[in-house]
Regions:
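C-terminal segment of classical bacterial N-terminal signal peptides
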Residues: 9, 13-30
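Absolute protein N-terminus
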Residues: 1, 14, 31-34, 130
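N-terminal secretory signal peptides that target proteins for export/translocation
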Residues: 1-9
């Protein structure tokens, strides 16, 4: 009887480990898909912004966690400069959703993304740019 329980427990443990590994694989795949989709969505942003420093808007490479309105070579709006923001996840999320509502008077003409999934994906892409 004890041998049967030990065997059953071993099988349950193996099944749990396999299940955990499959969840990790699905999670990694979802994260990669979000990043890829975020890069695709960024093409809208790339009309002005770049990751190479040659856009009409400021370069956004490494923007996550940085102070807003501090990139050299760009004339930011007084509205953005006066807010004293740091590009945290919450601030980026609000700005990407509706730039004019978050910083009235910003030079950003993009109206924003409505869907939470789109914002999540763009954030994943922005965080990857280092």
């Amino acid at each position: 009887m004890k041998a049967l329980r030990a065997t059953s427990l071993a099988r349950i443990g193996a099944a749990a480990a396999l299940f955990g590994a499959s969840l990790a694989a699905v999670s990694a795949t979802a994260s990669a898909a979000d990043l890829v989709r975020g890069e695709q969505l960024f093409h809208t942003c790339a009309a002005c912004h770049s990751v190479l420093g040659d856009g009409i808007g400021p370069d956004i490479t490494g923007i996550y966690g940085q102070p807003a309105a501090m990139r050299p070579g760009f004339n930011y709006s007084d509205a953005l400069k006066q807010r004293g923001l740091t590009w945290t996840e919450a601030n980026l999320r609000a700005f990407i959703h509706n730039p004019q509502a978050f910083v009235p008077g910003t030079l950003m003409s993009f109206p924003g993304y409505e869907r939470t999934a789109d914002i999540d994906d763009v954030l994943a892409y922005l965080k990857s740019l280092k």
